[in-house]
Amino acid sequence: MQFTLEFGGGLELLCDSVKIHKVNINLLNDSDILTMKDLLSWVRTNLIKERPEMFMKGDTVRPGVLVLVNDCDWELSGQLDTTLEDKDVIVFISTLHGG
Amino acid sequence: MMSNGGDSSEIVRELEELKLKKAEIEHRISTLEAKLQDTATVERYDAVSNGDSYLTAPELEHGLSPDQIYRYSRQLLLPSFAVEGQSNLLKSSVLVIGAGGLGSPALLYLAACGVGRLGIIDHDVVELNNMHRQIIHTEAFIGHPKVKSAAAACRSINSTIKVDEYVEALRTSNALEILSQYDIIVDATDNPPSRYMISDCCVLLGKPLVSGAALGMEGQLTVYNHNGGPCYRCLFPTPPPTSACQRCSDSGVLGVVPGVIGCLQALETIKLASMVGEPLSERMLLFDALSARMRIVKIRGRSSQCTVCGDNSSFNKKTFKDFDYEDFTQFPLFAGPLNLLPAESRISSKEFKEIFQKKEQHILLDVRPSHHFKIVSLPDSLNIPLANLEARLNELTSALKEKEDGHVNTGSCTNPSVYVVCRRGNDSQRAVQYLRESGFDSAKDIIGGLEAWAANVNPNFPTY
């Protein structure tokens, strides 16, 4: 399955300062589904190059990170249980405080 | 330069005096102008009562005066805004918290468009390094309160609105009283404890909150606590780790980025105040200046579990007043100096100057990020950023070894000391703490960093 993953608000610094990643993730077998929980652990293993604690806490994202699946807050689609589909766009954004 | 010291301090003193006088005169002018306008209105009414109605302004149901019709004509001509929108705007009151990068453009537009009453609160003074983004301030106000400067600018654009000045910090002790006087609150602050405090206060008072943030090349904007929408805590129930909270003064920001977000804050405020359009509630605008992308995303609604606005919340005015927001976020409301080390592990910038002059053997370690080091640095300093110190400790060891070897030849027997410097004297303390734990017992931090060096030793040393 193909996904577009975007990192913003400083989170891109954890993956070599690259903001947009087009990735291909293969399912183990055809009947399997891919959830946000699976995607997070894939991201942590494959994309996060430094300070993983700045991205995750436990099995979810750290406080202050918004997760958007197709421009929609993942709270509205089931958080970690959100089922992903081919060509979904997932955005991870750290909240800003400056001004 | 030294011989002119007396002259220049005299000039500076006179300049300060003149600037203060100028601000006072400007304030007096706008007060008088407002007064004149009121008198003119009364005179017109007098004319009506004398029966010369064909010579006077017609009495208009919307209550706009002829001057107001002329001033705001371009807004009145908008079918979707029109006279109702303007009339609502003139009756509304808005409090802008923070007269910095976000507050500057927001205040300019809010004053210009005719918000009836505009409150400005900020505890800070105008500095030269604010000017690139805090466009409401002028050089004449450097060293003066931002609120005074911003209020003068607002009055000079629109002398007919009421501008309230609060030259103080917003705290739990004064927040309820100040915020309660306004219809709409604009969060233009720069730190997590303020953001939680302002949102909680808006929930308690039932006020909509127009919240903007900007850092580096990115910005974010949303409207909280409006029409059943979420509050800040619904979105961020747990504060982020301190290491994820950066200030513009530490991480940098391109001036126009908060400018864009501040303008959009003004826009959302105008929409709320005039009751026109669709506010950015339950949605968030994300702005990425580098890639020229602006996306609007759907965010969650109000959380019934929210500790402040939720169904079973016991949060009240008393809880608010006693709440320690700095402790909750582990982040200071105001940037202040850290105090990690005992006195014997520290030296002042003046003491370090003597070491420099006496040519005592030492290593000067600068722990700022390398792009800071490139802006300016002290001569003969070794740059190892704090973040890499552990990994690059061998560079310090070999630099020390080199000095020691050089020393053997000169016959001296004292070991070279390590002095650590950074921009303001916080990271240097963290570095010294780490170095002492790693066996560098001579490590000392230079109190106040390069800013103290510039203030106390070399006034020609650039600060940023």
UniProtKB/Swiss-Prot annotation, chain A:
Q: How is it modified after translation?
A: C-terminal thiocarboxylation occurs in 2 steps, it is first acyl-adenylated (-COAMP) via the hesA/moeB/thiF part of the MOCS3 homolog, then thiocarboxylated (-COSH) via the rhodanese domain of the MOCS3 homolog.
User: Could you list the residue ranges forming a coiled coil in this record?
Assistant: none
Q: Which residues carry this modification: 1-thioglycine?
A: G99
GO cellular component, as recorded: cytosol
**Principal location class:** cytoplasm
Pathway connected to this protein: tRNA modification; 5-methoxycarbonylmethyl-2-thiouridine-tRNA biosynthesis
Cross-link Glycyl lysine isopeptide (Gly-Lys) (interchain with K-? in acceptor proteins) mapped to chain: G99
**Which key words are in the record?**
Cytoplasm, Isopeptide bond, tRNA processing, Ubl conjugation pathway
* SUPFAM superfamilies listed in its UniProt record: MoaD/ThiS
User: Which compartment or compartments is the protein found in?
Assistant: Cytoplasm
Q: Which InterPro entries match?
A: Beta-grasp_dom_sf (IPR012675), Mopterin_synth/thiamin_S_b (IPR016155), Urm1 (IPR015221)
Superkingdom classification of source = Eukaryota
* One BP annotation, GO: tRNA wobble uridine modification
The Swiss-Prot or TrEMBL record describes its family as follows: Belongs to the URM1 family.
Annotated function: Acts as a sulfur carrier required for 2-thiolation of mcm(5)S(2)U at tRNA wobble positions of cytosolic tRNA(Lys), tRNA(Glu) and tRNA(Gln). Serves as sulfur donor in tRNA 2-thiolation reaction by being thiocarboxylated (-COSH) at its C-terminus by MOCS3. The sulfur is then transferred to tRNA to form 2-thiolation of mcm(5)S(2)U. Also acts as a ubiquitin-like protein (UBL) that is covalently conjugated via an isopeptide bond to lysine residues of target proteins.
Q: By what name is this protein known? A: Ubiquitin-related modifier 1 homolog 2
Look up and give the organism this protein is from: Arabidopsis thaliana
Identify the gene encoding this protein.
Answer: URM1-2
